[in-house]
Amino acid sequence: MVFTVPEELNPIIYSNQKLLYDALYHAASSTLNELAKDSKYLGADIGYICILHTWGSAMNYHPHIHTIVLGGGLDKDSKWKDTGGKFFLPYGVIAKVFRGKYLCELKSLWNDSKLEFHGTAEKYQNHYCFKELLDECYKKDWVAYCKETFNGAQSVINYLGKYTHRIAISNHRIRSMTEATVTYAVKDYKNKGQWKEKTVPGEEFIRRFLMHVPPKRFVRIRHYGLLSCRNKSKKMTHCRNLLGCKKYISAFKNRSAAEMIKLLYNIDVCRCSSCGGKMVPHLPDKHTPSVLAHMRC
């Protein structure tokens, strides 16, 4: 599931990244918790993970929250409850509740004089301009995009895993550069997701890249409900027992660093890149100046 805000809010969000990124998490989590506990929809406590992204394919500013939501939850009797494969919350209701909660927190921060206003957001210091912004955003239909995991939960983890510890753009998308410009690949969603090349001045490329550096010590991956640190060990074990799931064993348990690199990136650091021979650790003796271990084939 993806929670997105209207682009009209981008200037004020960018001027207050820590506060208004946190507000995205607050609104998304409060929406999911409130609706999931409602007996009209599911009537259970659920678990989910939220991840903040701030970029679009062209490195434009596009703050939104990705969520991975369990397919059910625990009811008041600690019994597992789901809706038989269908998502238990109506998309339209999610979007409306999320809109109300986010704009309510934004208004509260403005009333408490906790917001800053820079660049194109300066005009929102004025009460009437800010009210017009809120009115415009209330009138809009917000987007809460939901999609089932066609290839299983692991495919979702693999997809989002590409972005959780990266920022904005990867090296392979940078096609070329000169002293003045940078050309990089972008996905054109208006043309069936076709890849095309975009060329921008070097300073503009750096500006776009730096827009997506998160605030210092900001936590982008957050766990809620049954998946929170407080509940995960006991309640998730209980859920697995109810569903008859096999005990989870980490794929990294008792593996060496080299084995984990092989598993994650399919790169064998123990294989010589020159001759293809197997590398073995070589520890220097006490007469060797270097104190570091070397790999030799």
Regions found by a protein language model. Give the residues of each.
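Beta->alpha loop/short-helix hinge microenvironment recognizer with preference
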Residues: 2-297
